[in-house]
C-alpha cells in the first residue's frame, strides 16, 4: 500500500494512512473479446461513412476534371479551326507574304495582351 502512494505521490489531504483502491468491476479495464459499446459502434460507423464520402468526392472530382479537360480540348480545337479558316479566307484575298506578316503581328499582339 505504501508503495502505491510513493509512486503516485502524497495525498493532497495529507492522509497517508488511506490506501489506494482499485475499481471493483473490470468494465473500465481492457478485456479480451470485449463487445463494443454503442458509442464505439457509432464512432466506427461515422469513420466508415466519412471514408466513403471522401472516396466518393475524390471520384466526383476526378470525373469533373476529366470532363473539363475534354471541354477545354474541344474548345481549343474549335478555336484553331476557326483561326485557320479565317486565314484561308484572308489568303484568298491577299498576297501570301502580307498574310504571313499579319499572322506574326497578331501573335505578337496576343502575347503582349496576355502579359
UniProtKB/Swiss-Prot annotation:
Family, similarity comment: Belongs to the CGR1 family.
Species whose genome carries this gene: Eremothecium gossypii (strain ATCC 10895 / CBS 109.51 / FGSC 9923 / NRRL Y-1056)
Function: Involved in nucleolar integrity and required for processing of the pre-rRNA for the 60S ribosome subunit.
Coiled coil: 40-101
Bilayer-crossing regions: none
Localization annotation: Nucleus, Nucleolus
Sequence ranges of Basic residues compositional bias: 96-108
Protein name listed in UniProt: rRNA-processing protein CGR1
A Pfam family matched in the record: Cgr1
GO biological process: rRNA processing
Alphabetized UniProt keyword annotations: Coiled coil, Nucleus, Ribosome biogenesis, rRNA processing
Amino acid at each position: 500500500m505504501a508503495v502505491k502512494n510513493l509512486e503516485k505521490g502524497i495525498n493532497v489531504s495529507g492522509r497517508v494512512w488511506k490506501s489506494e483502491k482499485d475499481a471493483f468491476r473490470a468494465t473500465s479495464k481492457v478485456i479480451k473479446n470485449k463487445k463494443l459499446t454503442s458509442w464505439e459502434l457509432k464512432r466506427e460507423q461515422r469513420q466508415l461513412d466519412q471514408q466513403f464520402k471522401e472516396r466518393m468526392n475524390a471520384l466526383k472530382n476526378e470525373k469533373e476534371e476529366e470532363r473539363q479537360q475534354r471541354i477545354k480540348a474541344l474548345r481549343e480545337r474549335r478555336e484553331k479551326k476557326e483561326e485557320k479558316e479565317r486565314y484561308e479566307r484572308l489568303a484568298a484575298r491577299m498576297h501570301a507574304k502580307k498574310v504571313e506578316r499579319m499572322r506574326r503581328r497578331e501573335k505578337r499582339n496576343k502575347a503582349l495582351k496576355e502579359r
